[in-house]
Amino acid sequence: MGFLIAYVFNLSPCSGDEMFETIGLAIIHFEGLNTNRVSKCNQNWHQESKQVAMELIQKVSQGLWELENCDTVNSVVVLGKEYPPVPEQRQEERHENGVNMFQHIFTRQGRWNEEFLADVHTRLHFTYRTRFVPIPRHPNGPSPMSISVMLRDNPLNVIENVLNNPDCFQTDIGWGCMIRTGQSLLANALQRACLGRDFRIDDNAANEHELRIIKWFEDDPKYPFSLHKFVQEGFSLSGKKPGEWFGPSATSRSIQALVAKFPACGIAHCVISTDSGDVYMDEVEPLFRADPSAAVLLLLCVRLGVDVVNEVYWEHIRHILSSEHSVGIAGGRPSSSLYFFGYQDEHLFYLDPHKPQLNLASYQQDLDLFRSVHTQRFNKVHMSDIDPSMLIGILLNGKDDWQLWQQHIASSQIIHLSDSKPVDLMLDHQLESAILGDRYLSEDGQGPSSKVDTGDYIDVGSFVPCTDSSCKINESEDEYQDVKCKNQRIVVVGETTTNGSPEVEVEKVLVEKETIPVRSK
């Protein structure tokens, strides 16, 4: 029998004052522990402990007291709104105004622009939740019980989950942070679309229209943007099992699908790019021709470096966040996502989802629910310290916004506008969709499978839209090809023709074995 007691501290992030807070206490009870199994568990324990330690280090950087403004020179920007800095008061002025050392430590008043603080406080912020409607574990997926959960959740919640739902997830601690930052991005886009950019909350009275948006994210399968719906779409579209960490691509696919299934949300369309910052005019302009006032959400998954963000992109990240059309960036650190909503000089402001709270349905009063998704605590990180993989959100409220935004990002090195998707890229995406997109349960019913194995040759000829002027089938140029090809075909893209489309030729090709024909829809 044994006990492990873990204390978690916060450290003030600004200045050299070492101020600590015990923000968590976890007591783990080991009864009847088989010592012969300890060595077998060491590796898994080490990996999970390492992840927990990284999260704790991140928390230590946040501080018990609110973030102080150490920069009194540079202005601050929140999703396209710029606020001037507040010069630091001299010590004697603080005394004259009755601001003693105690108040200096425990308050931020006078440190930040008050309008800036009101804007930050208005941002919708979703975090880890506990005790929500159970999500069944996938047979081949992660276990609901992990070191992260045992250390960070309330011990009573852990015990209750073990006793009542041992094969279900009732918290997303340790794996749901990218989903939560994706929810934050989507929620702030919905807030902007429904209430406008100048909307500000009253901390003493919940706004009825915003409450409706908040409840769409309640962690129950019946709500359109719940964690459960994200997990469901993540499995269907990206093969993500419950308990597995999402990346930007899986998150963007889930958001796109959920928005399409709930047109009453206020966003008419969601256009995504899962591998670049490329936006294609022929995908967006038809949406505004059909409805000039349509709200369109763009989600761009980009990678701006290998291990860290390349410095050449720093200014362009600031430029994106300075746009009035920006609804934030979901990203952060490897396996530890943050929601970025603004910047000051070379630091990005963010909201951290790694704070466990009770699920939204547990709040009896609307005001308590409302306050659980609005925080006055935020932090900042230098751009050299963030992960290069991120999800950029842009909201265009109608055709006029679309035209203004095009001008704003004309010089961007991250986002690029093109008339249409290149033919070779279209073929890549069509092949990917044919091979991976139509997922279905395998024979054992355990998970998504594909009709094509990765080792097979693929006949791509059927994917090419042929016309008399732009495409021709080269059946056989010599006897050797005609005998040995077995009807396998490749696509050859030639010069652009006079009508603007590339000349496409489908040829037979010699390979080692028969291909598997994959038909386009």
Swiss-Prot record:
Enzymatic reactions: [protein]-C-terminal L-amino acid-glycyl-phosphatidylethanolamide + H2O = [protein]-C-terminal L-amino acid-glycine + a 1,2-diacyl-sn-glycero-3-phosphoethanolamine
Active site: C177, D352, H354
InterPro entries named among the record's database cross-references: Papain-like_cys_pep_sf, Peptidase_C54, Peptidase_C54_cat
Annotated localization: Cytoplasm; Nucleus; Preautophagosomal structure
E.C. number: 3.4.22.-
GO cellular component terms, semicolon-separated: cytoplasm; cytosol; mitochondrion; nucleus; phagophore assembly site
Alphabetical list of Pfam families matching this protein: Peptidase_C54
Record keyword Cytoplasm present: yes
Keyword Protein transport among record annotations: yes
A GO biological process held by the record: cytoplasm to vacuole targeting by the Cvt pathway
Enzyme class: hydrolase
Annotated S-S bridges: none
Major location category of this protein: cytoplasm
Coiled coil residues, start to end: none
Function comment: Cysteine protease that plays a key role in cytoplasm to vacuole transport (Cvt) and autophagy by mediating both proteolytic activation and delipidation of ATG8. Required for selective autophagic degradation of the nucleus (nucleophagy) as well as for mitophagy which contributes to regulate mitochondrial quantity and quality by eliminating the mitochondria to a basal level to fulfill cellular energy requirements and preventing excess ROS production. The protease activity is required for proteolytic activation of ATG8: cleaves the C-terminal amino acid of ATG8 to reveal a C-terminal glycine.
Homology family: Belongs to the peptidase C54 family.
Protein name (database record): Probable cysteine protease ATG4
